[in-house]
């Protein structure tokens, strides 16, 4: 038998999808209070989700107790798997968690532009459209490679196995799911995804392109997961646990307007905000 092959295990290059907990302050109690406020109504929402602690937003002379943040995340049932830091933040390597290298979707320049836009938006009048207020300041969806650990935003994502096999039909880069998805099932499409049945609470549909759901959406829908800001979500009945495009999230903690809740809608990104508009089908 070749020494490079084994019936017992394999070592392969791969990718996993995870979240970034983006630290903006060294005030642990402020983070604890904000986590409690955001998730006290849905304490199981991110249960067992893996997360990497991202400290790159901290100033060069600021330090934070990574073990305490890991315990904080563990208290809300998230699973810290590593730390993302800039090269000058050598102190982060002292953590018991592995130091990971992230490849952001838009790069550091875009992050700076985002911060400037956020400051400008804070001084401007509030928009009146059905916009989302995503918790992206706390969580940003990323993907990672095993060589660096977990987080990296430009890598492919390997989905978790579904609870039961789901029959799929694919054409070019479009995947079609013709059965309802029950809690615990997850579908991943490298292009567009079309779902013909119910997406139940606890189910998850993920696509690098657009998502079309011709039934109620009650679970999670994540479109444009590889950073495609032009991706959209279409559904005939919007009742989601979570919607996301290119890492910008909206959860049930931010109630949907009555004119879109339970209605046919389309969802897209505009200036880093999720826009939700009723679909006029007649």
Swiss-Prot record:
**Presence of the UniProt keyword Cell cycle in the record:** yes
The UniProt entry's GO biological process terms, in alphabetical order, are: cell morphogenesis; division septum assembly; regulation of cell division; regulation of cell septum assembly
- Keyword hit for Nucleus: no
Q: Source organism's superkingdom?
A: Bacteria
Q: Where is this region: Disordered?
A: 108-127
Gene3D superfamilies linked:
2.160.20.70, 3.30.70.260
Q: Give the compositionally biased regions (Low complexity).
A: 118-127
Which Pfam families does the record match to this protein? MinC_C (PF03775), MinC_N (PF05209)
Function as written in the Swiss-Prot or TrEMBL entry = Cell division inhibitor that blocks the formation of polar Z ring septums. Rapidly oscillates between the poles of the cell to destabilize FtsZ filaments that have formed before they mature into polar Z rings. Prevents FtsZ polymerization.
User: Which PANTHER family does UniProt cross-reference here?
Assistant: SEPTUM SITE-DETERMINING PROTEIN MINC
Q: Which family does it belong to?
A: Belongs to the MinC family.
Q: This protein is called what?
A: Probable septum site-determining protein MinC
Q: Which gene encodes it?
A: minC
